[in-house]
């Protein structure tokens, strides 16, 4: 029995890497991974420039994981 080469469509990954930017206006950012199906990410995280926990909001998708 011979196996034929069949091309399959590449499946999408379940997680993506996104860039989160500080809302304190310092320009500090970091990368975080989230589920593809989830809504845009916003969370409290430490900003070392202002030495406080501030709100970080998802700015853009970087890549699929």
Swiss-Prot record:
Compartment list: Mitochondrion
InterPro entries: Mitoribosomal_protein_bL33, Ribosomal_bL33, Ribosomal_bL33_sf, Ribosomal_zn-bd
Top-level taxon: Eukaryota
Entry keywords, A to Z: Mitochondrion, Ribonucleoprotein, Ribosomal protein, Transit peptide
One GO BP: mitochondrial translation
Signal peptide location: none
Transit peptide interval: 1-8
Keyword Mitochondrion tagged: yes
GO cellular component terms attached to this protein's record: cytosol; mitochondrial inner membrane; mitochondrial large ribosomal subunit; mitochondrion
Keyword Ribosomal protein in annotation: yes
Entries under Pfam families matching the protein: Ribosomal_L33
Gene3D superfamilies tied to this protein: Ribosomal protein L33
GO molecular function: structural constituent of ribosome
Stated family: Belongs to the bacterial ribosomal protein bL33 family.
PANTHER family (alphabetical): 39S RIBOSOMAL PROTEIN L33, MITOCHONDRIAL, LARGE RIBOSOMAL SUBUNIT PROTEIN BL33M
Subunit structure and binding partners: Component of the mitochondrial ribosome large subunit (39S) which comprises a 16S rRNA and about 50 distinct proteins.
Protein name: Large ribosomal subunit protein bL33m
Organism: Mus musculus
